Amino acid sequence: MDEIQLRNLYGPATEKASAKIMKSLDPHSVSFINASNFLVMGTFDGEDIDLSPKGDPKGFVKVISDDRIEIADRPGNNRIDGLLNISKNATVSLIFFIPKVTETLRVQGKATISNDPKVLEKHKLKSNLPKTVIVIKPTKVF
């Protein structure tokens, strides 16, 4: 089915759904991110899509400003599929979850990977530094 067929079948998006899309973080989205202890990050290298779960105690994603968030990448299975995808294609999509909350928050943006010691230090957990930090500039928030 193409877009016209789908729109004819489903109709237009509701005004409320269309209006909630923002280009940067607002106070509600910042609060949601700060309360989240789990997210899934989607990346694409031009050929393959990867969905990477990320979790730590709430507040593990640092909101630096309305147009910069940082996510520590801690050692795990070392597949680093998402990081490899970001190195080829900066576009990422995140969905944040909060336990027992039915609402989610989605953030799309452009990502870079940092191993700057000053950036890593902000993400220290129990004296352990992450290997890298994913820095995201949101382009769409809803």
Model-derived features with residue positions:
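Binding-site signature for planar aromatic cofactors or substrates
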Residues: 1-142
